[in-house]
């Protein structure tokens, strides 16, 4: 019996096994191996090659059709700054590598990418029991230009979590923003969410600090998106519209959202500028505090008194803790 040796050399394997990709900084002149890059950078470089290949195929195809490019969740393994840069630079990069206009569809769950995009180019998709709801933010902007200008500026400067939340809680200020999450956890421990299967702490809700003066501007927007919302705001009692007052002596409110809400409940025209009576605010029923999927809450009387703000209401129901005497009723 004779033994033979067959050598199999494949040029593809030789190149793959013996070649190392490096990155060189033009100014420093220092080369680093690709292993020094994170997965986010590697994915970004891979996408660059895929896009270049896609562009080349379009040039060779010579068809009259508009080429479509779908990029699904590019934020995977990218840090926020990289997501922002990628979303902003994508169209510029495509215009550099191709003379043909490429219509791009980019799907994402990233608030950073949504924050980079022009609102008129955003299409909101929501899965419901009846199917997928698809909404054009550009259409909302045309119908509500004033609201859209404010929402666009606010979300751009703060956060776009609203697009990816199952529900949203709008709060008055920093106190509510800090206390509400803790209150939700304590309510859960006390069993106040029972018998709900998926309790609020396990749901994806967005907590957005917006202030009582502007929360009403978001109401048409969340109604358009179909997102349930809760507004927690201050009653802000006033004597005559200019002078602050304790609730028991107040005549109206300075809170624009509450005034907007009462006008909606009473069916008053938007042009109506008459003062909203504090009595009408206090007497709102639970049903009247709900419009579609939006609900509003503010301070109510406890221990014979009604606080003007959340801070006053907390002190009122914890008088012993704060060393306050019992209220005179």
List each language-model region with its residue ranges.
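Alpha-helical coupling/stalk and coiled-coil linker elements that connect catalytic or binding modules
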Residues: 1-31, 63
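Short alpha-helical segments and helix-capping/turn motifs at coil-helix boundaries
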Residues: 3-7, 31, 107-109, 213-217
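Short, well-ordered loop/turn elements at secondary-structure boundaries
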Residues: 17, 40-41, 64-65, 100-101, ...
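Structured core elements
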Residues: 20-22, 33-36, 70, 77, ...
